[in-house]
Structures are given as C-alpha cells and as structure tokens.
Amino acid sequence: MPPLLKLALELGPLLVFFFANARGEMLIERFPILGSIGAPIFLATALFMAATVIALAISWSMTRTLPIMPLVSGIVVLVFGALTLWLHNDTFIKMKPTIVNTLFGGILLGGLFFGKSLLGYVFDSAFRLDAEGWRKLTLRWGLFFIFLAIVNEIVWRNFSTDTWVSFKVWGIMPITIVFTLLQMPLIQKHSLTDEENTAS
C-alpha cells in the first residue's frame, strides 16, 4: 500500500472526527435529520465510527490483511463509540485513547516482563534489529503508550470537549511523529546487516 494512502487511512477518521465536532452545529442546521443524534460530539462519534469502518475496509480490500494496531484501535472505537451513542455519554469516547494506549503499553511491557520483545513480531517484516534493539525499542514504546494514556486522562478530565478533540487530532499525532523520529538513532545502531540477517 502506498505510504500516503496508508497515512490518509490512519488520519482520515481523526480528521472526520475533528471536522464533525467543530462544524457539528452547521451540519445539523443544513441536515436537520442529524440533529436526532444529539450534540456535535455525538455526531462526531457516529461519523468517526463510520470513517473507521471505511478505512479498515479499504485497507483490507487492498492488502487482504489488517495491521494489528489499527484493528484493535478500530474495535475499541466501535465498542466505546456505541456506548457513547447508546448511553448518550461522551465519557466513553473520551476514554477510548486511554484504553487503547494502556492496552498496547501493558502488552508491550508485560511481554518484556516475560522476556519477549513483542514489538519485533509486529515490525520484523519492516526492519531487522538485534535482540537488544528490539528490547529497548519495545520498552520505549511501551512507556510511550502509557504516557499517552496519562496525557489523555489529564486533558479530557480537565479541559473542554472541543479542547480534547483538538488535542486528540493536532496534539497526539505530532507528538507520536516526533517520538518515532527520535527512535531512528536506536534503530540505526541496532539494525542487522544483510550478512547478519542471513545468519539469523
């Protein structure tokens, strides 16, 4: 899959979520039937769920596989989105990033506790690292996911819904990109050569 399309499929649902929340009242005025869903955050949640399903469907149709992280995130979006709409309580969709990041962080750190660098099983086809490299990278990403979970809790519990939505779209992604780039020296240091790949 082309990298730009992959990025679009990952960012698309988030942009739909942001736009629907920011322009929800305008959309409801133009399409009154949408008013039955409720406040803009509930409309945004419904469209976020739909966009997530569409993105996963496109990814599956092109590759016949679904990456584990987008798949798990998508399932949580649908479950917590459904709870948000059913109970008419936006707490559930706000807690979704906390649940997903805690889950990923817990799995990675738990794997390390049992001597398994699980990140290697996910990205081994993308690049090859030695055992120490995978261990360090798994530890860093595990702690980073826990950090994101804590930050999400702080933001949604202490700021307005609009601020939380903006941070979710325009804050988390840049932070993640910067963190990813900061891992490049580690990846380069522990990358296996072609000879080492063949030997392994």
UniProtKB/Swiss-Prot annotation:
Identify its protein family.
Belongs to the YciB family.
> Could you tell me the keywords of this UniProt record?
Cell inner membrane, Cell membrane, Membrane, Transmembrane, Transmembrane helix
Q: What is this protein called?
A: Inner membrane-spanning protein YciB
- Which gene does this sequence derive from? yciB
Segments crossing the lipid bilayer: 1-21, 37-57, 66-86, 103-123, 136-156, 167-187
HAMAP family xref list:
YciB
Q: How does it sit in the membrane?
A: Multi-pass membrane protein
Superkingdom of source: Bacteria
Q: Which organism is it from?
A: Brucella suis biovar 1 (strain 1330)
Subcellular location per the Swiss-Prot or TrEMBL entry: Cell inner membrane
A GO cellular component annotated for this chain's UniProt record is: plasma membrane
Its biological purpose is as follows: Plays a role in cell envelope biogenesis, maintenance of cell envelope integrity and membrane homeostasis.
Major place of residence: membrane
Pfam families with a match to the protein in the record: IspA
